[in-house]
Amino acid sequence: MTGVQTCALPISRPDEEGELALRPGWPSMFRGYLHEPERYAKCFVGGWYLTGDLARRDADGYFWFVGRADDIIKTAGHMVGPFEVESALMEHPAVAEAGVIGKPDPTIGELVKAFVVLKPGHAADEQTRLDILGFARKRLGAAVAPKEIEFKDQIPRTRSGKIMRRLLKARELGLPEGDLSTLEGSS
């Protein structure tokens, strides 16, 4: 970001992940949450604004987006970014779309579950599911790859095209769906 001092906390060497932090004070920075000063104050640590985005810095000093901190899946001692898993799944020739969540599991904390929309001409059957699971394990490793895959006709997205992972998770766990005003196709 031109003119804005950035860092990723607590990164000290290249290719480590951390939360993207910005020095406040640029003209377009938001000034607070309406009627929630405590929430706004929690966004700052040591003079840095914590964005909630995870990033890694490469050897040239460039930052690469990893995912949202609140989307991170904690599974068997690993921190898994859903974007990483979704991107790998999208490389499979049968996969048109993918959305990934963490599903509570008493043994490993959360298991990685993927919701997949298939490309035309591919069957939503056990063989396809096993093929995609195997593909993901080879790309990501057994600890990061999904343990479950569910085929869907569509993945819920916001009007701006972002996957609504919180909605996938709420529906999976039978929880209230919350605010759907940004859901693509809602009126």
Language-model features: where?
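Short proline/glycine- and acidic-rich turn/helix-capping motifs at secondary-structure junctions
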Residues: 149-159
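Ser/Thr-glycine-rich phosphate-binding loops at phosphate-binding pockets of nucleotides
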Residues: 9, 51, 75, 158-160
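Short, small-residue-biased leader/transition segments that mark boundaries at the very start
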Residues: 1-9
